[in-house]
């Protein structure tokens, strides 16, 4: 018979996979507090992303807490002179690198632009 993990209990050593399973039932997203991971124009081609808390749920048995305690500024590339584009600012969880980063997903200039695709796999998971 396979073991059943009960988490957390005092005096028991756990692995990261046990903590990941603990967070798995939470829904992916950003904590709904005011100004949590808020993106605002910061002048020129920069945007400011505020601090925040969120969760990613890349698979049925994994969930990870994301905590960013300070704001960051991201630089966008210069736009096409005649064709608009849509960029996305995402929190990208990268399982291979074992970290989450803020990233700009740059769209393609087009007369009818669409937002770039996001990833929702167990290895790379984007929160928009």
What are the functions of these language-model segments?
Residues 1-59:
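N-terminal "first-domain core" detector
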Residues 4-17, 51-128:
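Beta-strand-rich solenoidal segments
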